[in-house]
Regions:
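Canonical P-loop GTPase G-domain recognition
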Residues: 207, 212-214
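Localized chelating/binding microdomains
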Residues: 9, 185, 193
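Metal-dependent phosphodiesterase/nuclease catalytic metal-binding core
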Residues: 49-182, 191-207
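Short, charged/polar "capping" segments at the starts of alpha-helices
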Residues: 24-29, 151, 189-192
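Conserved residues at the C-terminal ends of beta-strands
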Residues: 21, 145, 183, 213
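Short histidine/acidic/glycine/proline-rich micro-motifs that form metal-
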Residues: 18, 25, 126-127, 185-189
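Active-site HxH/HxHxD metal-binding segment of metal-dependent hydrolases
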Residues: 1-41
Length: 214
């Protein structure tokens, strides 16, 4: 985050919008200001926007973000990004182009708005909010933490409120994501252990969906 802000500031680019949990906004602002003073003896320009779980954020003409509630020792949220499109209403699917044009000319609304999930990202969490948004399971790409992977670390996952590999295995049949990107893996594991342990828990078809960000 400091690199993102400082590079825009030094290049004279207008500050980007940074969405952060409302509970942590003040602390994040303090940290950024102190790093800024250390870096250039001045204050960077940035824009922090507080969000709450279940907020809907319109951040481009055709993109919206839903704030997903997560469970962690401190406030943590995830984001589901959806593309907004207009599609022809089902009742007009059998009409010709000229018929649809005539309806539009007469003032009939022939389209409706739909939202198509594109990517979901989960921050630090001990739960996966599958029931908090109906499109989460449909997201083509799901990026999730998976801090602990070995059986002996199940209690540690509970104590620190992070996800264990067992929970990822459990939700795989419920999600349609083509890419399930696992990240935030504990540094206690070496690369070989991570790859062998994780891929051994999934079927061949699910292995093709799993991507590791080590």
């Amino acid at each position: 985050l400091p690199i993102y802000i400082s590079q825009r500031w030094m290049a004279g680019i207008s500050p980007g919008k940074i969405f952060v949990p409302a509970d942590g906004l003040h602390q994040i602002s303090q940290i950024l200001d102190q790093i800024s003073k250390l870096d250039c003896n001045s204050l960077w320009t940035y824009e922090l926007i507080p969000v709450q779980p279940n907020d809907r954020i319109e951040f481009r003409n055709n993109l919206v973000a839903y704030v997903l509630p997560l469970t962690h020792r401190v406030t943590s949220v995830g984001y589901l990004i959806c593309e907004v499109r207009k599609k022809l209403k089902p009742e007009f699917h059998t009409l010709s182009g000229s018929e649809i044009a005539a309806l539009k000319k007469s003032g009939v609304t022939v389209t409706h708005q739909v939202e198509l999930p594109k990517v979901a990202y989960l921050g630090d969490t001990s739960t996966i909010p599958m029931n908090d948004h109906p499109l989460l399971a449909e997201s083509p790409t799901l990026i999730s933490e998976c801090t602990f992977i070995l059986p002996e670390d199940r209690k540690k996952a509970v104590d620190t409120m992070h996800l264990h590999l067992d929970q990822i295995v459990e939700i795989m049949p419920k999600i349609k994501s083509r890419n399930v990107v696992l990240t935030h893996l504990s540094r206690r594991y070496d690369t070989a252990t991570i790859q062998q342990t994780i891929f051994s828990r999934f079927s061949r078809s699910d292995q093709e969906r799993i991507k590791l960000l080590i």
